[in-house]
UniProtKB/Swiss-Prot annotation:
Protein name per Swiss-Prot or TrEMBL: Kunitz-type serine protease inhibitor PILP-3
Entry function: Binds and inhibits MMP-2 and shows an activity in inhibiting migration and invasion of neuroblastoma. Intact C-terminus is crucial to the activities of this protein.
Site (Reactive bond for chymotrypsin) residue list: N41, A42
Disulphide bonds in the chain: C31-C81, C40-C64, C56-C77
Organism: Bungarus multicinctus (Many-banded krait)
Recorded GO CC terms: extracellular space
Length: 83
């Protein structure tokens, strides 16, 4: 294969990698479930990942129960689900 062909192939692979949405990359499955406030009434500030909007959103967590799409900080949510 010529060097021009290799450059074209490399460029196409790079473009594909950049355009591939996060949802099709390896992401924890729990990042796709809706937020669950839990059964208690503590009203704790928490964050969940919204796959449709591709961002972490604040919600009120009851303090017990719920699911794994529940993070103490927006940064932790982003590191786990959005990167």
């Amino acid at each position: 294969m010529s060097s021009g062909g290799l450059l074209l192939l490399l460029g196409l692979l790079t473009l594909w990698a950049e355009l591939t949405p996060v949802s099709s990359r390896k992401r924890h499955q729990f990042c796709n479930v809706p937020p669950e406030p839990g059964r208690c009434n503590a009203n704790v500030r928490a964050f969940y990942y919204n796959p449709r909007l591709r961002k972490c959103i604040e919600f009120s967590y009851g303090g017990c129960g719920g699911n794994a799409n529940n993070f103490k900080s927006r940064g932790e949510c982003k590191r786990t689900c959005a990167e």
